[in-house]
Amino acid sequence: DLPPGPSLRRFATDVVMATKAVAACNHHAYTLMHGIDDGGIVAGIAGRLTKTPWVFERTGDFVPDRSRGLNSFWHTFHRFLERRALRRAAAVIGNDTGMIELFSRLDCRSRACVIPDIPAIDEEISPSIRNLAMARYRTERGQKLITCVGSYSRFQGLDLFFNAMPHVLSTRPNARFVVVGGDAAEIRRMTQALACAGIDESVCFPGRIETEELAALLSISDVLVSPRRAGMTAPIKVLDYLKSGTPIVAADTPANRAILSAENAVMTRPIPAEFAEGIVRLCESPHLGAELARQGRETLRRERRSPQAFRQALDHCYAYVLSTT
């Protein structure tokens, strides 16, 4: 796996991808190319070399994690390539209106298309998978299951969730927390930290799991949490949360407010004690949770966040490109 953010390894990977893209374009006359995030840079390079129009889709914020030792040169070089690819693209796609400000700074407003993200999980949950999830994650009768899907960077805010756990357990000692994601080293490091706090037995780290199992886990949970601190665009996982029909507690930050509000989630300040209060509130108020979950699914419907609507919007974008190139 590549580390997050620009790096020598990522640049080398982009060079290989661009070489393959150029070879593919020379072998077959493509009408246009569609690149997503780093793939947009690759499409820009290949498009310039082969005179093939390209669409650059930028799916969200890039917030570098300086604590992981990002090299400033690669960050600057990545930004340079990204800006050139965005400015010269036949069209650019953003996942919400917040991206328009970025595109306007890059002189892309006239050819910017806003296509809202849709939930990534589209699997039907079979009874057998649901039963397996119940057996794996619910270890006691009457247990409250609180789940978070995310990475281990401050950008994602998992530290807020971890620091809220002792507050939740002081009120709901039968609570069980599930944290999806992370590699073995990250999980080992966090398990050791939780052991020092004496709460490691209340937390389950399944790592990265299959999509069908994740869908089942979200559906059987009592509360889903989104502690994301930074960024401006809604994380895809929140859309999966809304689709699952399980109530949400979220940090009141711009990224979460892009799709969540007091209408469809419990919003709290990004403070551990207050985040814990929101979790406990949903654990003790099933009727509130049911109403928030209903409103969450209505939000997806109202904002047309479905595969059918996504394909229709993408068709319109492609039609625009083909009519102007």
Predicted regions mapped to residue ranges:
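An aromatic- and histidine-rich active-site surface loop
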Residues: 13-18, 32-50, 55-63, 97, ...
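Membrane-proximal helix-turn-helix segments that form the acceptor-binding/catalytic region
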Residues: 19-26, 41, 45-49, 62, ...
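Donor nucleotide-sugar binding/catalytic pocket of nucleotide-sugar-dependent glycosyltransferases
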Residues: 75-130, 139, 148, 203-206
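Acidic donor-binding loop of glycosyltransferase active sites
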Residues: 90, 216-233, 246-247
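Conserved donor-binding/catalytic core segment of Leloir-type glycosyltransferases
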Residues: 140-156, 162-165
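Nucleotide-activated donor-binding/catalytic signature segment of Leloir-type glycosyltransferases, i.e.
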Residues: 188-212
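Conserved acidic donor-binding segment of nucleotide-sugar-dependent glycosyltransferases
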Residues: 262-273, 281-287
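A charged, aromatic-enriched C-terminal amphipathic alpha-helix characteristic of glycosyltransferases
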Residues: 287-319
